[in-house]
Every structure is written in structure tokens, then in C-alpha cells.
Swiss-Prot record:
It comes from Helicobacter pylori (strain P12). Its cofactor is Mg(2+). The keyword Cell division applies. This is Phospho-N-acetylmuramoyl-pentapeptide-transferase. It catalyses: UDP-N-acetyl-alpha-D-muramoyl-L-alanyl-gamma-D-glutamyl-meso-2,6-diaminopimeloyl-D-alanyl-D-alanine + di-trans,octa-cis-undecaprenyl phosphate = di-trans,octa-cis-undecaprenyl diphospho-N-acetyl-alpha-D-muramoyl-L-alanyl-D-glutamyl-meso-2,6-diaminopimeloyl-D-alanyl-D-alanine + UMP. Its main location: membrane. Keywords: Cell cycle, Cell division, Cell inner membrane, Cell membrane, Cell shape, Cell wall biogenesis/degradation, Magnesium, Membrane, Metal-binding, Peptidoglycan synthesis, Transferase, Transmembrane, Transmembrane helix. Its EC number is 2.7.8.13. It comes from the Bacteria. GO terms for cellular component: plasma membrane. HAMAP family: MraY (MF_00038).
Length: 353
């Protein structure tokens, strides 16, 4: 909106620069989240929209009165900042907003069910998976129709591994959407544990998106160019800004939780950025914390079903360390450090290829 008005009609040259609009979007989303979140917290407390706490984690019972669904606020702030600062004629921007809203809506349905039924189960697994499946399918098909190439790239290699057939690419992209959204959802179990690794991952991906959309940088760095994708940089930075605003209230002890409304939206948008910038494989490194959390659950369930033995004291793995006596803050900060280092290594692949 501001982009079209100030650059399109008044020819204010500052707004032609992607970096300026991305920075402006960051601060708009940050301050809007800071402003709206206290009001949301008061409303949520009045409505008793609190996160039901699992009986298997007795140390978290003091959090039972903490409101949830804070993800609605930072998703809303991101959309406002994107509408103001990004070009809405860009399909990658529009699809990015659709991903945020769509995955957040599925999360909202799950959060609402948990609050309404006052248990931690939420929607049935079949319904939740079905909604995520359809949403992932729609976005993946739209990306294919948009003409996004289907080459599969590996980190630190300048040439693609191979070109996927269209049907295989759509199926693969759907897998990335489904696995990443659920991985971030599983990670969201301690104060700030999902938000900071999401910030690191989004910052890394936003750099890759910017390079992919810039002809000079992509040529110099031997990085695959994706026409028009650079505009998504504005939306990504807006989401990072809103996450910093959310973290202001979500740091330990949290005043609000993001809920599935936030975690599914984050996972979906991270997956979307990875797909359009051809970083599906590198996402395993950038989202290392999400991968480890998910693997811990898979291994725990698999071990118990096949051997009737548990590999961990509790899964996801952040609860395992809590059960071993680690303070919550120690678990959180150490996981942050791992995430930061993983993303620094991932960024090296821009130059080392």
C-alpha cells in the first residue's frame, strides 16, 4: 500500500529499495506487536483462553493461567506490515501471506478446541493433518503453476542434484510444509524455545531469498536465481520483527504463549521460504533444533512400540533435559546457541560452493 502510493504515484525513490522497505516492515511489525500484545493478554485472560498444561509435566503447572494464541497477534502484525511495505502484485508475497493465514487458522482451530475442552489434545489428528495436507497441496500446486523450477539443490554445491518431475516436486514440497510446520509445533514447549530458533532460521532464509531475487548477487555467488522472489524478503523481515515483539512477552517467565496459531504459521512460512529459495535440504541444518525435537518424538514412539522401552525420560527432547534436572532457562539458551551456530554454518554455503 505505502509502496504503491509513495513510489508508484509520488515517485519517492526511497521506497524502490527492497532493503529500506524490509527494514520499515520490520519496525512496523515489531512496534505493532508490542502495542497489541498487552491488550490481547488482558482479553485472553478475561476469556480464560489459557493453555491447558499436560499432567506429565508437573513443573509447568504454574503456567496454567498463562494465555495462549499469541501467534494471532504476530501473524496479524506481519500481515499489516507486509500490506504497507511489500508489493501486493507479487505472487510470492501473496502466497506467503496465504501460508501465514492458512496455517495460523489451522492452529487457531486446534487452540480453540484445547481451550474449549480444557485438555491438551486439541483437534483429532486426522482433522488437523487433513487441513494441513489440503493447505500444503494448494500452495505447492500454485507454486508449480507459477513456474517455480523443480531443481533440487544441496548445500555447498553450485549445480543442482537433479530436476524433479512436477508431480514429485509437488509431493516433496508438501512434505516440507507438513514436516516443518509440525516440527516447529513440537518445539514450542518452553518459553521462547520456538520463537528464537525461528528468528535465526527466518533471518538466514531471508538472506537466501534476497540473493535469489537479485540478479547480480545470485550471479556472483553462483546461486540459483528466482525471478521476483526478492519481494518476499519484506514479508520475512516483517515476521522477524513481530517475533521480536512477541519475544518481549514470551521470554521466561512467559506472559503469553504463541499456541498452535503461531507455531504452525511459523513452520509453514519457514517451509515456504526454504522451498522458493531452493533450500529444502539446507533447512535440515538451519532448523536443526526443530529436526532434533521431531526425531526425539519419532524415536521415542518407535522404541516404545517395538521394544516397550523409552529412549528418553520424556519427549520432545527439551522435556528430557528438564527431567534430568536442567533449569528451563538453561535448556532454552543452550538450544538457542545450537540454532544460532547451525544457521551461521548454513550461511557459509552462500560463498562456499
Amino acid at each position: 500500500m505505502l509502496y504503491s502510493l509513495l513510489y508508484g504515484y509520488f515517485n519517492i525513490n526511497l521506497f524502490q529499495y527492497l532493503t529500506f522497505r524490509a527494514g520499515l516492515g520490520f519496525f512496523i511489525a515489531f512496534f505493532l506487536t508490542l502495542f497489541l500484545m498487552p491488550k490481547f493478554i488482558l482479553w485472553a485472560k478475561a476469556k480464560k483462553a489459557n493453555q491447558p498444561i499436560s499432567s506429565f509435566v508437573p513443573s509447568h503447572q504454574n503456567k496454567k493461567d498463562t494465555p495462549t494464541m499469541g501467534g494471532i497477534v504476530f501473524v496479524f502484525a506481519t500481515i499489516v506490515a507486509s500490506v504497507l511495505c511489500a508489493s501486493l502484485g507479487n505472487l510470492y508475497v501473496l502466497l506467503g501471506i496465504i501460508v501465514l493465514v492458512g496455517f495460523s487458522f489451522v492452529g487457531f482451530r486446534d487452540d480453540y478446541t484445547k481451550i474449549n475442552q480444557q485438555n491438551n489434545a486439541g483437534m483429532s489428528a486426522k482433522m488437523k493433518f487433513g487441513m494441513l495436507f489440503v493447505l500444503s497441496l494448494v500452495v505447492s500446486v500454485l507454486l508449480s503453476l507459477k513456474g517455480l523450477d523443480t531443481f533440487l539443490y544441496a548445500p555447498f554445491l553450485k549445480n543442482p542434484l537433479f530436476e524433479m518431475p512436477t508431480m514429485l516436486a509437488v509431493g516433496f514440497w508438501m512434505l516440507v510444509f507438513l514436516s516443518t510446520s509440525n516440527a516447529v509445533n513440537l518445539t514450542d514447549g518452553l518459553d521462547g524455545l520456538a520463537s528464537v530458533p525461528s528468528i535465526f532460521t527466518l533471518l538466514s532464509l531471508s538472506i537466501f531469498v534476497y540473493v535469489a531475487g537479485n540478479a547480480e548477487f545470485s550471479k556472483y555467488l553462483l546461486y540459483p536465481k528466482v525471478i521476483d522472489v526478492g519481494e518476499l524478503f519484506v514479508v520475512s523481515l516483517a515476521l522477524v520483527g513481530s517475533l521480536f515483539g512477541f519475544l518481549w512477552y514470551n521470554c521466561n517467565p512467559a506472559s503469553v504463549f504463541m499456541g498452535d496459531s503461531g507455531s504452525l504459521a511459523l513452520g509453514g512460512f519457514i517451509a515456504y521460504n526454504a522451498i522458493v529459495s531452493h533450500n529444502e535440504i539446507l533447512l535440515v541444518l538451519m532448523g536443526s533444533i526443530f529436526v532434533v525435537e521431531t526425531l526425539s518424538v519419532i524415536l521415542q514412539v518407535g522404541s516404545y512400540k517395538t521394544r516397550k522401552k523409552r529412549l528418553f525420560l520424556m519427549a520432545p527432547i527439551h522435556h528430557h533435559f528438564e527431567q534430568k534436572g536442567w533449569a528451563e532457562n538453561k535448556v532454552i539458551v543452550r538450544f538457542w546457541i545450537i540454532s544460532m551456530l547451525s544457521n551461521l554454518v548454513a550461511l557459509l554455503s552462500l560463498k562456499v560452493r
